[in-house]
Amino acid sequence: MVHWTPEEKQYITSLWAKVNVEEVGGEALARLLIVYPWTQRFFSSFGNLSSASAILHNAKVLAHGKKVLTSFGDAVKNLDNIKKTFAQLSELHCEKLHVDPENFKLLGNILIIVLATRFPKEFTPASQAAWTKLVNAVAHALALGYH
C-alpha cells in the first residue's frame, strides 16, 4: 500500500481537476508510440502508425489514450487502494495482451512530461514528486499480474 501525505494528495487531485482527459490521454499515448516505436506492436489494429504525424492524428490512438487516462483517473479517485483498482487491468495486460510491464513505466514518465508542459505553473517540483510517486504506483499495480 502506498502512503500519501495530505500535501501529495492535494497536488495530485488539484492538478487532476484541470486535466482534459481526452487531450492529455491522446497526447500521452501518441508520444509513447512515437518515442518508443516498439510499443506500436500492441496497437496493430489501429491502422497507420507510420509517422509521428500519422500517430498524432490517428483517431484510434487518441480514443485509446482517452480510455487509458480515464482509467488512470480511477487511481486518483482511489489513491489508498491502487492495487485493487487495477487488479483486472493487470490481469488483462499480463495474461491476454502480454504487454511488457516496463511499458507502464514509460507511459507514466510520458504522462509526467505532458502534464508538465500543459501546466507549467502548477507542476512544481513537489507536484512532480507526487505525480512520479503516483505513476510509479500505477505501473507497479499494473505489473502485479506478472508475478
Swiss-Prot record:
SUBUNIT field: Heterotetramer of two alpha-D chains and two beta chains.
CDD domains named among the record's database cross-references: Hb-beta-like
Domain of life assignment: Eukaryota
Disulfide bonds: none
Function (record text): Involved in oxygen transport from the lung to the various peripheral tissues.
Keyword Amino-acid biosynthesis: no
Pfam families in UniProt: Globin (PF00042)
Protein family membership: Belongs to the globin family.
Tissue specificity of this protein: Red blood cells.
GO BP terms in the entry: hydrogen peroxide catabolic process
Positions that bind heme b: 64, 93
SUPFAM superfamilies hit by this protein: Globin-like (SSF46458)
Residues that span the membrane, as ranges: none
InterPro entries: Globin, Globin-like_sf, Globin/Proto, Hemoglobin_b, Hemoglobin_oxygen_transport
UniProtKB keywords: Heme, Iron, Metal-binding, Oxygen transport, Transport
Identification of the protein by name: Hemoglobin subunit beta
Alphabetized PROSITE patterns for the sequence: GLOBIN
Cellular component annotations (GO), alphabetically ordered: blood microparticle; haptoglobin-hemoglobin complex; hemoglobin complex
GO molecular function, a single term: oxygen binding
Domain Globin: 3-147
